[in-house]
């Protein structure tokens, strides 16, 4: 019997073990998509206790922050909400999580133990009985160990690049301060997330467009030309601040062509307080997406598209706690044709940007895999990417399926690899988790005689997927 999470964790063959230890284990990390606050990096925040890091709490504006994965585990174990997002003492909240964790057999939440081993040197197993021991150990280190500040965690994880997620109206003041601080050796760059400027059919759109106008020094954005001009202005500002990628979180990918005059009329209608039809919303969104895609191409910014998430489906809890509190699910929208149409429209004028496509529904993997091959060109290997297994899929089965599907339909060797998509500074162990799964998958193919035992080729593939491909793709 293998020991729990030993040095050969998830590496089930001699070839897998060799590939991991020789080529994957010590590679730098390019965390090109995450949700960590740049302010906490600049201020080098030190956390008071492990519950703050893992379970989060409330922001000054009343919204919630924390790890949705852990919240869902606790809810699934019958833990009252007051211990999850409520105001119970942190020690009690941590106890409830520790008691729930043993029930998570087969769940990737067990990477919690990988975090304890990697950052705190704890080789035991967290459960209700060991919670006090772990609480005391972690809190002592968090409060006193210089390696366990925010920057210390990033540095000891060998992170070379962090791409945060930022709204177009953000001043990027913390990014500016990070760039000017010579003691910060890793790169932190903003990513352009213009969802609120596309959500013409959702509450708060007109108010947001007023904020976008203010961000570009205007009293208002009176027409669709004003909107595209403002977005271009902000993209260029982000590019000056080192932006390498955009990100679009869409319920589904729209594609409905319209003239500028039609789109302007739709925009004017909504800004006047009227409601647009779903078809009108799609016309506006398509027009803006095409404009943005052309700007990304011009500036060398990669376009990330995340879709097929149905958000806030528990109406009662969504009303009580707000969005992004763990009440989202996989959707079943079918929009492969629309993705292809969007890329084709951009390709017509040779303005299709580097694009990474993520669907929350793993049933879309084959369709995405076939889309990729339709729009590749000589600009860069793997210009159109199938994004890493996302959110509800970033576990062993999901990662193996995504990479196997990509290998079957495209070139796995050009894959840009893993990202944390996380709000936690302890989450860099997810890259290690991914690398072990990657090496085990490739190692098994070699062991089974499905790929030659070519050391040079295997080294290039493993190092590429772990870091080198992302380094090239994002111009690091």
Where are these regions (language model features)?
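Short secondary-structure transition/capping segments
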Residues: 43-44, 316-318
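Short glycine/proline- and charge-enriched loop/turn segments
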Residues: 318-326
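Metal-cofactor-binding active-site regions of metalloenzymes
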Residues: 2-299, 351-353, 357-369, 373-476
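C-terminal amphipathic alpha-helical interaction region
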Residues: 303-305
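Divalent-cation-assisted or electrostatically stabilized phosphate/pyrophosphate-binding catalytic cores
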Residues: 332-339
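Hard-cation-handling environments
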Residues: 309, 314
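Short, basic/hydrophobic alpha-helical segments
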Residues: 342-348
């Amino acid at each position: 019997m293998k020991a729990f999470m030993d040095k050969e964790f998830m590496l089930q063959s001699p070839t897998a073990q060799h590939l991991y230890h020789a080529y994957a284990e010590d590679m730098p990390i390019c965390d090109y998509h995450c949700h960590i606050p740049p302010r906490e990096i600049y201020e080098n925040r030190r956390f008071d206790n492990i519950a703050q890091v893992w379970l989060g709490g409330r922001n000054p504006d009343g919204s919630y922050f924390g790890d949705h994965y852990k919240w869902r585990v606790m809810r699934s174990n019958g833990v009252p909400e007051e211990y999850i997002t409520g105001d119970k003492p942190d020690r009690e909240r941590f106890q409830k999580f520790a008691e729930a964790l043993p029930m998570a057999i087969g769940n990737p939440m067990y990477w919690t133990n990988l975090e304890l081993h990697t950052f705190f040197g704890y080789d035991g197993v967290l459960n209700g009985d060991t919670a006090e021991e772990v609480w005391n150990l972690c809190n002592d280190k968090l409060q006193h160990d210089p390696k366990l500040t925010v920057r210390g965690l990033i540095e000891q994880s060998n992170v070379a690049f962090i791409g945060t997620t930022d709204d177009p109206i953000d001043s990027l003041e913390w990014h500016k301060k990070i760039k000017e601080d010579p003691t910060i050796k890793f790169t932190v760059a903003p990513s352009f997330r213009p969802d609120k400027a596309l959500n013409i059919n959702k509450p708060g759109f007109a108010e947001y467009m007023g904020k976008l106008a203010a961000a570009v020094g205007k009293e208002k954005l009176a027409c669709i030309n004003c909107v595209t001009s403002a977005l271009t202005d902000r993209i260029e500002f982000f590019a000056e601040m080192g932006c390498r990628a955009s990100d679009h979180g869409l319920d589904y990918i729209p594609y409905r062509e319209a003239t500028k005059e039609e789109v302007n009329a739709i925009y004017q209608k909504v800004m006047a307080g009227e409601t647009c039809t779903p078809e009108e919303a799609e016309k506006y969104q398509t027009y803006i997406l095409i404009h943005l895609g052309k700007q990304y191409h011009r500036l060398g910014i990669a376009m990330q598209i995340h879709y097929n998430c149905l958000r806030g489906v528990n109406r009662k809890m969504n009303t009580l706690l707000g969005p992004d509190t763990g009440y989202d699910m996989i959707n079943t929208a079918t929009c492969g044709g629309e993705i292809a149409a969007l890329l084709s429209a951009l390709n017509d004028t040779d303005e299709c940007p580097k694009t990474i496509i993520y669907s929350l529904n793993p049933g879309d993997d084959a369709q995405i895999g076939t889309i990729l091959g339709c729009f590749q060109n000589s600009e860069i290997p793997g210009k159109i990417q199938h994004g890493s297994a996302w959110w509800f899929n970033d576990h062993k089965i999901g990662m193996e399926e995504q990479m196997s599907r990509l290998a079957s339909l495209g070139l796995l060797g050009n894959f840009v690899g893993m990202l944390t998509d996380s709000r936690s500074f302890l989450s860099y162990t997810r890259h290690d988790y991914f690398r072990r799964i990657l090496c085990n998958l490739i190692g098994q193919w070699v062991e089974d005689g499905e790929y030659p035992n070519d050391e040079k080729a295997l080294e290039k593939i493993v190092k590429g997927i772990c870091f080198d491909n992302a380094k090239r793709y994002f111009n690091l």
